[in-house]
Amino acid sequence: IPSSWTSFEQVDEDQWALVRNLRDDVNQMLEIARNDKLVGASLDAAAFVHVPDEATRTILDKLDGDRDLVSPPVKTNGVDDLRTSLMLSQVNLVNSEDAVSEACEAIYVSKGEKSGCTVGVRQAEGSKCGRCWFYDEKVGKLGLPHADLCQRCDDAIFSWEKATGNKFSKEEEKVEEPVP
């Protein structure tokens, strides 16, 4: 195994330790929201996060992806986004604890014990993509060939159709009833 696969710069280790801690704090709030039937799956949720210091904010800003699910991604590589790492449809880094409280009901807001961030959760905005299940505010609004998909998934389906010559269909093959 190449050493580049098994050893990382300290900044990477610190970054992912922070993300894991933030994920733990978000998951605590998600459990409360699930118990109250505010959300079901984690992709039904959006998180609002206030970061207490500049060093932490700098790390999280690097992972803050595009607001919409676009292809190709603009702000990050599209894989290591906070939303993907936290398994949420949306993550909003905000500038104050008050902004978290304004966006989320008080019962779903907490000062994270592990990350030190103030974290709140609420129902994600937009519609659920029929392929990736992330919520996106532009699903069904862009006039795409597959109206129930986000732009990123529509692009993936288009690429697949182009490469294979097949047409994507969500409808299952209809099995005809045998004639008696």
Placement of each model-derived feature along the sequence:
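Flanking scaffold residues of small Cys/His-coordinated metal-binding clusters
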Residues: A124-S127, L144-P145
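Short metal-binding segments enriched for Cys and/or His
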Residues: A156-K170
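Acidic, turn-prone loop/beta-hairpin segments
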Residues: I1-M29, A33-D64, R83-L86, A103-Y108, ...
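Eukaryotic N-terminal low-complexity, Ser/Thr- and Lys/Arg-rich leader segments
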Residues: N166-P180
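Short linker/helix segments within small regulatory modules
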Residues: K138-D148
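Short cysteine-rich clusters marking metal-coordination/redox-active sites
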Residues: C129, C150-C153
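Cys/His-coordinated zinc-binding microdomains
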Residues: W133-D136, D154
